[in-house]
């Protein structure tokens, strides 16, 4: 065998090994993200049961999520700084283990005096030491032409994990409360325990794993060039594209937040669905995530992520507008269908809006910091929306409260479409220049 043939075989083997490594790392990130976040977002399936189990009302539930949102906003910028300096695997291991321990405390249903503390600390363990390390690690694994695919596979893949865990949890919850005659509180505790032990088991797995030797291309991408923090912040804040991206994520996150109240809307919005039936529909909605996330990502790589994102923003906004009027026709099937459709579009949005970071001219060495800057503003709805949702549904009981809340969400969806169109126009001008 001649020298050229040998080199060709070595190159092919190296590329195959690099691809196996990158997709293996992606799979681990997917499992971690799909397990850690549902712990504190069980309201999207069990909101009414949560209120009964914890002995609180809608407004108090809003305070809990607002406290967690405050922790998120405080965490995002330092999270980006940490992601630029510490190994992601260690940060992710800590996050999983700490979140699992918090979930065990949460499962004791300690009362409203302690619940805000649990939710605030949950915001730190899933925000400060997890969020930016997750996204920076993912961006470094994906080639330039794979950004949409990798981010879509992250969101879609974690959707498979979330939906699988949610289906198992719902089966246990229904069996214990319907067949075994246990209370809603006991059934809800069982659900929390499932997520708690899953997080702890994953933390042990990540702790035992050893970081494999990275291919040269990946190592080069991940190299950190230390710079002045204030200078880096000044540089990033002067990028118009980064601010437009922030607006897009901010508005898109409003659309996603609307899905958290779908279970309560189906149950309390005059449609007459039971807690189990509403939970079944919203669990089915979770299964839209792999289709929306992965499908949107693959389509984004073919057409550009931003174009697909614009279409998804428009359709999700129209879907929520349709949900506002669905109760006028008392259409259970229509409302359930809209919930699934909105879920599909919203998950496509989530799978794509971080992929557009690639067109914002952000250097690799400050990617984590850029993610932190965008996240601080774009995820601030974590503070405001729980309060808005809690106040409107508490002061305007039934369908009216949800119509007011969803009308605000639709307005934000329209603004998101406008921001995306402006960014698309700027990119087109830059390419034409």
Regions from the PLM with identified roles:
Residues 304-356:
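C-terminal transmembrane helical hairpin of 12-TM major facilitator-type secondary transporters
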Residues 43-47, 166, 239-293, 350, ...:
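Extracytoplasmic gate region of multi-pass secondary transporters
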Residues 170, 174, 196-219, 419-424:
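C-terminal membrane-cytosol helix-exit motif in multi-pass small-molecule transporters
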Residues 5, 210-231, 432-433:
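Flexible cytoplasmic inter-helical loops of multi-pass small-molecule transporters
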Residues 85-96, 301-315:
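Cytoplasmic membrane-interface "Motif A"-like loop-to-helix N-cap segments
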Residues 148-174, 375-386:
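Glycine-rich segments within core transmembrane alpha-helices of 12-TM secondary carriers
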Residues 75-87, 292-305, 393-394:
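Helix-to-loop junctions at the C-terminal end of transmembrane segments
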């Amino acid at each position: 065998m001649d020298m050229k043939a040998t080199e060709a075989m070595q190159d092919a083997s190296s590329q195959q090994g690099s691809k196996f490594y990158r997709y293996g790392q992606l799979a681990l990130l997917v499992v971690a993200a799909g397990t850690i976040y549902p712990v504190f977002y069980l309201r999207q399936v069990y909101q009414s049961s949560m209120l009964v189990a914890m002995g609180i009302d809608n407004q108090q539930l809003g305070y809990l999520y607002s406290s967690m949102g405050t922790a998120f906003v405080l965490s995002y910028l330092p999270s980006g700084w940490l992601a630029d300096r510490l190994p992601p695997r260690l940060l992710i291991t800590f996050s999983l283990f700490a979140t699992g321990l918090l979930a065990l405390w949460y499962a004791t249903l300690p009362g409203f005096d302690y619940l805000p503390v649990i939710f605030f600390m949950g915001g730190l363990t899933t925000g400060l030491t997890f969020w930016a390390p997750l996204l920076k690690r993912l961006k470094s694994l994906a080639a330039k032409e794979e950004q949409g695919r990798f981010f879509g596979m992250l969101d879609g893949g974690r959707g498979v994990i979330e939906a699988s865990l949610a289906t198992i949890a719902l089966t246990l919850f229904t069996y214990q409360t319907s067949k075994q005659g246990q209370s809603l509180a006991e059934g809800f505790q069982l659900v929390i325990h499932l997520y708690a032990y899953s997080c702890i088991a994953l933390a042990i797995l990540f702790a035992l794993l050893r970081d494999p030797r990275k291919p040269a291309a990946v190592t080069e991408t991940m190299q950190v060039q230390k710079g002045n923090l204030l200078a880096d912040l000044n540089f990033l804040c002067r990028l118009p594209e980064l601010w437009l991206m922030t607006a897009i994520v901010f508005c898109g996150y409003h659309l996603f937040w609307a899905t958290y109240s779908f279970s309560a809307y189906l149950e309390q919005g005059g449609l007459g669905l039971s807690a189990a039936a509403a939970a079944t529909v919203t669990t089915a909605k979770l299964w839209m995530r792999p289709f929306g996330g992965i499908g949107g990502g693959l389509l984004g790589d073919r057409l550009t992520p931003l174009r697909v994102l614009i279409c998804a923003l428009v359709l999700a906004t129209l879907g929520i507008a349709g949900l506002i009027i669905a109760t006028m026709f008392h259409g259970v099937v229509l409302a359930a269908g809209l919930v699934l459709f909105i879920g599909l579009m919203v998950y496509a949005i989530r799978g794509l809006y971080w992929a557009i970071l690639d067109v914002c001219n952000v250097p690799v060495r400050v990617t984590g910091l850029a993610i932190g800057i965008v996240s601080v503003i774009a995820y601030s709805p974590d503070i405001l929306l729980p309060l808005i949702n809690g106040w409107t549904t508490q002061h305007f009981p039934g369908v009216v409260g949800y119509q007011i809340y969803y009308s605000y969400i639709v307005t934000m969806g329209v603004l998101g479409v406008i921001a995306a169109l402006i960014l698309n126009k700027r990119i087109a001008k830059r390419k034409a220049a």
